[in-house]
Structure formats: C-alpha cells, structure tokens
Amino acid sequence: MRYDKLTIIGLPKKFKVYYALDYLYPDGQLPDNPDEILYDEWPADGDEGEDAMMVYEYNKSATGVYLAYNENVHALSFELSPWASDADVKLYVKLANAVLKKHPRTKLYAQYDILKGLTEEDEKKMIADRQSYVKRLLKTKEGFTMEGLFHGCTLKDAHLRPAPTLDIQARDLRQLFADMQWEKEGKEEEKQ
C-alpha cells in the first residue's frame, strides 16, 4: 500500500519518541484539561535499540499508528496497518508532517524515495488504498481476520450486512470495525 511504512532520518540526539504526540498540539505540549486530549499512546515492543509506541486518536482509531525510534541512527519509523481507519490515516499524515515541521533538517523516506512531506492528496490515496483492500477481500467471499487496537475480529461472509454496492459495504465494515474497538473497551470498563 502507498506509504504504509515511512522513515524520518536525521533527528537530533535529544529526540524522544514519547514526546512526538506533543507536536500535534498548538503549544507543543499536552493540554492541561484532560477533555482536550485527543490522542494517546502506549509503549510497544520494538527491535533492539528502539523505543516504540502505538499512537491513536480517542474514539476514532481502529489500529493506531506504530512509531519506532532508533537511537543509533536517529531515525523514526512509522507503520500503518491495512485495517487503519480514516482517522488513523489522518493521524499518520499529521504526525509525519508535524515531526518534519519541528525538525526541518530531517528527511522523509518512503523506501528509497525522498518526500518533502505528505499532502492531502497522499492522504486521500492512502484512505482509498485501504478501502479497495477491504473491497478486494469482500469480493473473495472468504473470511478474513482484522487486527485492531484493542480487539481483532474474524469475519465470515455470513456476518456481513447486505449493502447496495461493494463500496458501501466496505466503507460500513471499516467504520464498524473502528467503532467496535471503542464500544467493547467501554463495556469492559463498565464491568470492572
């Protein structure tokens, strides 16, 4: 898929991946009011010598964005799942552009291509890629497993709601999957 793995090279030695989310806020730091916090993260497993985390947007993300910072080469890697919701794609683009803006001497690589940043057009193409990926899987009429932030789901053809077109069915499924991540999480918290 288009730009599903990106790397920013040339970050300063003092860069910490855990502060990357702060770049998305106007003052460069988390708001004092917890209700104004839109994004969050949790530590993830990275390769040796890497600090990694999953970044997500509350109530909208399906898979989140995987970030890994390698201190040895001063590189920040971004990864986006094929199951990512539109909100995940937007977060991915915002975060990459925010890091580039904060550190203007860095370079953004998509495999061997150097990019100046991600555009709105790139964002639309990335969303369309994910939509067509789900559509292609729906055409096979076979089951498949979607991995999310909090929950995965194995889907069989019998589970699908009928829709007038495959486009609508794929869009509805992607939205339902994103909503499912947050509904189940809320129900589990109520039980505790």
Q: What is the role of each PLM region?
A:
Residues 1-192:
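Acidic (Asp/Glu-rich) sequence patches and key acidic residues
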